[in-house]
Amino acid sequence: MFSKEIFRDMFLPLYEELAAHCHNMGVDFWFHCCGAITDILDDFIAAGIDVIHPIQPIAMDQQKIAKKYRNKITFLAGIDVQYLLPRGSVQDVINGTKKLIDTFDHEEGGCILAASNGIMPETPLENIEAWLKTAESYGREKRLSYK
């Protein structure tokens, strides 16, 4: 852990350079960062990061982040793989998946569904299946509602 000032002085210029290089090559800059990055998310966006992963559910307020940044960055929005997916019921996973879609998806796009990190080996297959099926069916239903 380090202060925002150290991040801005030491690391941000490197992210700006990486983002510029990616954009010069015609590709988006995707970035993964675990933990609570709310205080430096504006910096990442200003640096040119196009896609951020995962907006970790136990570390940040997903609803506030989605509302504030929805037209500024694309979210590689992650289902909670630490608690919900491995320990929740199938219905919990279905509800959590719908909430994730409702939180991050909007008419202009800006949401790619994923896991918030690696799926734990002890995760019940029924939960993984419920997550993927719900993401596909509810996500499709949501997209069709925008037309």
Spans of features found by a protein language model:
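Active-site loop segments of alpha/beta catalytic cores
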Residues: M1-K147
